[in-house]
Amino acid sequence: MSTATATSMKLTAEQESENARINAENERLRKQARAKRTISLTLSYVALALVTFLMIFPLIIVVIVSFTPNAVTQTWPPKIIPSAWTLDNYTSLFQRLPIGRELLNTIVFAGAVTIISVFFDSLAAYGLSRVDFKGRGILLAVLIATMMIPAMALLIPVYKLLGSMGLVNSYLGIIIPRMADVGGIFLLRQFFISIPKDLDNAARIDGAGEFRIFAQIILPNAVPAILTVGMFNFMGNWNDLLWPLIMTSKPETRTITAGLAMLTGHGSSVTPYGVTDEP
C-alpha cells in the first residue's frame, strides 16, 4: 500500500470521526432545545391554566351561591361548597321577574345599538379618514374632547330631553343616545387610515362614488376593526345597568340587568344574595 493511499484512508477516517462527533453534538443540542421548549410550553400552559382558573373562579362562586340559601351565604367563615343546596332562588326569580321579556328587551337593546352605532361610526370614520375637507382636524379634536365629559354629567339632561319627547320607557329612548360612539369612530378611523388610498383612486377612475368605495372597498378591508367595535358595543350595552335602570320603569322595556337590580337591597343594609327573601 502506497504512502498516499494510507494518508488518504487516514484522512477519511478522521473526517468520518469528526462528522460523527459533529452529528452527536448537533443531536445533543437538538435534544437540549426540545427539552427547553417542552419546559417552556409546560410552564406556559400551567400559567395559562392558573390565569384561566382565576378568571372563572368568581363566576363559579356566583353559580354556587345561586344554589345556596341566603342564610347559608351569610355564615362565617364562608364555604366554597355549601352545606345546603336549593332551587328556590331560581323558582322565586322566575316568579318575581318576567325574565323572558327582560331578556328579549336586552337582546333588542344591545343588538340594535350595536348595528346602528357600528354603521354610523364607520360612516363618520370614513369621512374623517378618507375625505379631505376644511376643519377635519378640528372636528376630530372636538369629538375626542367630548370623551372627557363624564357620562354621569349627561344623564339628567339627556333624561329630561327624552322625557320631553315622550321616549321614557320605550326602546327608542334607550337606543337613540347610544346610536354613535366617539371611541368607535376613533378606532375605525385609525384602521381606515392604514388602508392604501390607491384603492380609492382606482375605484374613482372606474367611476365609483364615495358610498360605493365605502361599501365595497373600505368595509371589506376593515372587517377585523368593525367586529372589534361591534363586540365591545354589544358587551358594553348588554352589561349596562345605569342607563336602562334610569330610562325604564316598566317590565315591557326593562333590560335583564335593570330587572335583577330590582331584586337587591329593598332598603335593607344587607344584600339578600338569595332572591327568595321578600322585600
What function would you assign to each model-found segment?
Residues 22, 41-279:
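A structural signal for multi-pass alpha-helical bundles of membrane permease subunits
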